[in-house]
């Protein structure tokens, strides 16, 4: 009873928010009438409300041994300066080339038939009178059959290819880099937003200062947009709410 009451209150609350959401959406659309979508300003990604520092399991830190009269600095990669990204704020080019193909085709068929018959000629001297009175015969028989079949098929084909520059926002204690990249491209009245973030090993950054997406751990890749086309392809708030609460 209490669960049903809470569900009713939640439904009424969502319905009450429909006019507010519709008004906010209308105001946002009216503010962009005759103008393309506004591009966001360049800001520090670590100052965003959604930014969270990355923490990962790390090995214990060990102090480097002192080497007297050595020409090599501890942790150096080469005698000459390495031009690859290595510090917070350095840029690195991220290459995303995703080509996924998946196909599943499953089929299940089950068929079972059972038939049993047995008689009771003498039941404690009654000689089957009880059975014959119930079934009209001196024996019992049972029969059952079941048949079921199911098929399922899934086919997916996705391709994403892009290049964008990212920034090292964090250097983890084990030396790995947290890289974040964002790019906005506006074409007519549609704004495309590209975003990539993940953890990269320094040795996976090539000599031309690039790294591929398959070398990024915990990679998060987003490709979306906003504008006239996105508004036409997105269901209205009322339709989304009704799809969420209607059971049929």
Swiss-Prot record:
List lipidated residues, N-palmitoyl cysteine: 24
> What is any one GO biological process for this UniProt entry?
bacterial-type flagellum-dependent cell motility
PROSITE patterns under this entry?
A: PROKAR_LIPOPROTEIN
Give the Gene Ontology MF terms in alphabetical order.
cytoskeletal motor activity
**What family does this belong to?**
Belongs to the FlgH family.
- Taxonomically, the superkingdom here is Bacteria
Q: Which NCBIfam families does the entry link to? A: PRK00249.1-5 (NF001305)
Tell me which UniProt keywords the record has, alphabetically: Bacterial flagellum, Cell outer membrane, Lipoprotein, Membrane, Palmitate, Signal
Role this protein plays: Assembles around the rod to form the L-ring and probably protects the motor/basal body from shearing forces during rotation.
Lineage, broadest ranks = Bacteria, Pseudomonadati, Pseudomonadota, Alphaproteobacteria, Acetobacterales
Lipid-carrying residues in chain (S-diacylglycerol cysteine): 24
Instruction: Give the signal peptide, or none.
Output: 1-23
Per its record, how is this protein called by name?
A: Flagellar L-ring protein
Q: Which InterPro entries match?
A: Flag_Lring
Q: Quaternary arrangement and interactors, per the entry? A: The basal body constitutes a major portion of the flagellar organelle and consists of four rings (L,P,S, and M) mounted on a central rod.
Tell me the compartments it is located in: Cell outer membrane; Bacterial flagellum basal body
Please give the organism.
Answer: Gluconobacter oxydans (strain 621H) (Gluconobacter suboxydans)
Q: What is its main location?
A: membrane
Q: What's an example GO cellular component term for this entry?
A: cell outer membrane
The record describes its membrane topology as: Lipid-anchor
Q: Name one Pfam family in it.
A: FlgH
